[in-house]
């Protein structure tokens, strides 16, 4: 096989046709190796265009067609895999034989094949259909006659409960590629999704996510004219289902506000029965609806869609307002206990939905995040023992701090930080007590045992098993990430609180944390080092000991070791900074040449013809220049006598002394004139800046950051949104539009936005004063030369003004640049 690989693709394919395909009994065992070579070597694509190569390719496709009609299911399975590898690299094979293969593969879906054969057949047909996008001729020949039959067969397989993940993936791929053809099958596909999501059977989370994404993509099957309206109607119908489910769960709670909903055009079956029997099903439906809403916000949209942002905020606020302290109706204690048991799960779902909204359209959440912080405080204080509430709340707060870089007041998160520190302290105490018990039991048991090797092995197993059961690594990871965000973005923390954070970090390092927790711990140590603050002790030596020891560089996990290596490089750059190299010392001759090339000699004779530079008051910070004389500065003949040279030197020295005295005397007389000139220039610049600010205030403000930007514009009733990414984790260009309207919708273009520090601008100004001496000669002296670095957007000058009248939300971004004060220096 290696010799054939070295010769090229043509001999290799010939050998497969002559030897491997002829032996059908051993063919299924050779298919994995052949498929791997086809994928990596691109053998069919590299056959060439010669007559011999075209003949070999035709024989290859004909052999696959014959194998696909075999009676042996193993041969059919082998043919499907090889067909999938062939169409992935050869467009000619797809055009010539794709229609025949598609009919045979779709016919296989009606046969009692094995689940693996059905899955690979559906994947291959879906690959054929998606490859014809943008080619109308091939689409009419291959897709149009075969796609309806393929969809019917897939739905029949899904109803039987087989290959559900593959069916959802293939249907979603078909909707993305050929959405108008799926219009007759919208209701059937929706019923399949509801059966998977809201059924009584327990399904894996991966299947639930695929079904939710498929449900959120059905709006594409409508005509192009109703694209945006159907997307909006779909998400509003899910919100209506959510409110109806909450009505059932909160039927015994006296809510401060009512949310009436009409029970019409519902997609999910109505909840019936007693509260004790149906509350679990209602909670499961809330999880399903929350997953569908997140899928709507995450999937890609080809056009701008309308997002009812206020309706989503109402849903979030409704769940947040229901706390354990709210009054309830006179019900049995068992029903009240069930209600209190449901609340933490609902708060976790709302935290996840808020986090997704914050990723998709940050301005809508930032402007109302103050009320969310109060609700999060109440939830965490009353439900701190629930892992989901704690993790989701900390993730939301960390994301808010990392994206906005805002200095939130300490009163907003002080209780949350205290709660996190208490959790870490309890975890460290539990680890310490368990380690003491293990050591005592090990010492007592070693006396009874006969062999040392058995005791060491048993103690090792016990300690490793117990150490992983003492705390939840996900919760520890969220706690460390939240504390790192607090240290990074909080300017002033109390000394006691800051000391507690460092102590808890060091105490947890004494245990045996997992790899994920170790990486978060390294980030927290770096955040503590990079943000010193007011603390009682220095944490740098302890951080170096942890990161360079068994919990860092020497850790067996390569991810932990690589992260520790980068952390150590950061710490080393802080402790031992490297200054730039010194410049090479020049010889006297080179130094004189460099000096003469940079400075021109000033003429001491005939300076009356030099005109002073004209200061243009209409230009912005233009540098004045001294005009050099047209004649050569020195017209000398060859000097050979040393006495003449000494006399010339003395004359130059006396002339320089006179010039310095003259310039000192005239600078005192002309100081008022220079100050007047500076004030005139600044007044002109101030008027110009005021005019520019008035002009810019009427235009939409834009905040640019690399490739990510936010365009805040004013529209009439709605704000537009276009979700340009199908994956939640991908960050791309963001265009967010906020409105000054009375409508409850928002149009957006977006997935994720990041706010960073703004670039700085260097402003330089050089103004020269032309002084005259008693003889009428002019002398140019620099009045002021300075450089001032200012931030283009400062925290003190940046403000977001939000004004609202009743239910109308009016959102504006007013960004003002800091003024630059230029004052003349009297000592210039």
Curated annotation (Swiss-Prot):
GO terms for cellular component: heterochromatin; nucleus; rixosome complex. Its main location: nucleus. It is found in: Nucleus. Residues 604-618, 652-667, 694-705, 816-828 have a biased composition (Polar residues). It comes from the Eukaryota. GO terms for biological process: rRNA processing. Residues 805-814 have a biased composition (Acidic residues). InterPro entries: ARM-type_fold (IPR016024), RIX1_N (IPR012583). Residues 604-707, 794-828 are annotated as: Disordered. Component of the RIX1 complex required for processing of ITS2 sequences from 35S pre-rRNA and the nucleoplasmic transit of the pre-60S ribosomal subunits. Regulates pre-60S association of the critical remodeling factor mdn1. Also required for heterochromatic gene silencing. Component of the RIX1 complex, composed of ipi1, rix1/ipi2 and crb3/ipi3 in a 1:2:2 stoichiometry. The complex interacts (via rix1) with mdn1 (via its hexameric AAA ATPase ring) and the pre-60S ribosome particles. Interacts with crb3/ipi3, gcr3 and Las1. Belongs to the RIX1/PELP1 family. This is Pre-rRNA-processing protein rix1.
């Amino acid at each position: 096989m290696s010799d054939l690989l070295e010769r090229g693709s043509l001999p290799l394919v010939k050998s497969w046709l002559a030897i491997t395909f002829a032996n059908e009994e051993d063919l299924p065992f050779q298919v994995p190796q052949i498929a791997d070579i086809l994928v990596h070597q691109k053998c069919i694509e590299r056959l060439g265009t010669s007559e011999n190569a075209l003949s070999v390719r035709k024989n290859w496709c004909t052999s696959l067609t014959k194998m696909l009609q075999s009676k042996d299911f193993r041969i059919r399975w082998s043919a499907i895999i090889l067909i999938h590898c062939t169409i992935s690299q050869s467009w000619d094979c797809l055009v010539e034989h794709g229609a025949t293969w598609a009919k045979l593969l779709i016919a296989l879906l009606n046969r009692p094949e094995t689940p693996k054969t059905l899955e690979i057949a559906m994947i291959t047909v879906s690959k054929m259909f998606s490859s014809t996008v943008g080619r109308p001729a091939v689409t009419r020949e291959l897709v149009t006659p075969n796609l309806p039959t393929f969809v019917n067969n897939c739905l029949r397989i899904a109803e039987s409960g087989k290959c559900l993940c593959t069916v959802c993936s293939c249907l979603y791929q078909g909707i993305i590629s050929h959405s108008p053809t799926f219009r007759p099958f919208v209701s059937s596909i929706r019923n399949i999704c509801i059966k998977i999501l809201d059924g009584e059977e327990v399904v894996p989370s991966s299947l639930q996510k695929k079904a939710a994404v498929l449900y959120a993509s059905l709006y594409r099957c409508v005509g192009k004219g109703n694209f945006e309206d159907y997307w909006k109607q779909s998400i509003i119908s899910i919100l209506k289902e959510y409110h109806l489910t909450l009505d059932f769960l909160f039927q015994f709670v006296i809510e401060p506000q009512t949310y009436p909903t009409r029970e019409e055009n519902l997609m999910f079956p109505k909840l019936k029965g007693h509260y004790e029997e149906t509350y679990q099903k209602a909670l499961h439906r809330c999880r399903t609806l929350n997953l569908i809403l997140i899928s709507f916000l995450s999937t890609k949209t080809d056009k701008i869609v309308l997002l009812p942002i206020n309706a989503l905020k109402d849903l979030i606020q409704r769940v947040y307002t229901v706390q354990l302290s709210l009054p309830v109706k006179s019900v049995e204690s068992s029903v009240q206990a069930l209600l209190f048991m449901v609340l933490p799960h609902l708060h976790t779902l709302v935290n996840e939905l808020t986090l997704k909204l914050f990723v998709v359209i940050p301005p809508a959440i930032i402007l109302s995040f103050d009320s969310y912080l109060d609700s999060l405080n109440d939830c965490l204080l009353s439900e701190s023992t629930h892992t989901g509430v704690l993790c989701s709340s900390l993730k939301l707060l960390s994301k808010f701090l990392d994206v906005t870089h805002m200095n939130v007041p300490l009163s907003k998160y002080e209780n949350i930080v205290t709660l996190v520190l208490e959790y870490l302290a309890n975890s460290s105490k539990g680890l310490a007590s368990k380690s003491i018990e293990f050591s005592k039991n090990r010492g007592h048991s070693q006396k009874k045992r006969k062999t040392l090797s058995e005791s060491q092995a048993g103690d090792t197993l016990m300690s490793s098993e117990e150490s992983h059961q003492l705390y939840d690594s996900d919760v520890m990871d969220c706690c460390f990430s939240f504390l790192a965000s607090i240290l990074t973005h909080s300017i002033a923390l109390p000394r006691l609180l800051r000391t507690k954070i460092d102590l808890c970090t060091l105490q947890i390092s004494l245990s045996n944390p997992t790899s994920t927790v170790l990486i978060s711990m390294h980030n927290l140590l770096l955040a503590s080092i990079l943000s010193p603050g007011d603390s009682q002790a220095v944490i740098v030596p302890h951080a170096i000991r942890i990161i360079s020891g068994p919990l860092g560089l020497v850790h067996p996990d390569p991810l932990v070791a690589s992260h520790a290596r980068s952390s150590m490089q950061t710490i080393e750059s802080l402790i031992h900074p490297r200054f730039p190299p010194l410049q090479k010392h020049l010889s006297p001759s080179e130094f004189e040449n460099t000096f003469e090339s940079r400075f021109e000699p000033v003429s001491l004779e005939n300076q009356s013809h030099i005109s002073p530079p004209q200061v243009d008051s209409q230009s912005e910070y233009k540098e004045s220049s001294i005009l050099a004389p047209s004649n050569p500065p020195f017209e000398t003949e060859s000097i050979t006598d040393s006495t003449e040279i000494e006399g010339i030197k003395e004359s130059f020295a006396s002339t320089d002394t006179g010039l310095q005295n003259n310039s000192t005397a005239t600078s005192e007389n002309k100081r008022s004139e220079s100050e007047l000139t500076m004030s005139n220039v600044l007044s002109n610049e101030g008027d110009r800046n005021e005019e520019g600010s008035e002009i810019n205030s009427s235009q939409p403000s834009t905040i640019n950051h690399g490739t990510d930007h936010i365009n805040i514009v004013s529209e009439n009733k709605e704000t537009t949104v276009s979700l340009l990414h199908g994956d939640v984790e991908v960050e791309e260009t963001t265009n967010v539009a906020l409105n000054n309207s009375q409508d409850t919708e928002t149009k957006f273009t977006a997935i994720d936005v990041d706010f960073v520090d703004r670039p700085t601008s260097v402003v330089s100004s050089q103004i020269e004063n032309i002084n005259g001496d008693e003889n009428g000669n002019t002398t140019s002296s620099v009045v002021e030369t300075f450089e001032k670095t200012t931030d283009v957007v400062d925290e003190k000058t940046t403000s977001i003004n939000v004004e609202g009248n009743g239910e109308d939300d009016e959102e504006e971004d007013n960004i003002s640049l800091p003024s630059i004060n230029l004052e003349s220096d009297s000592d210039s």
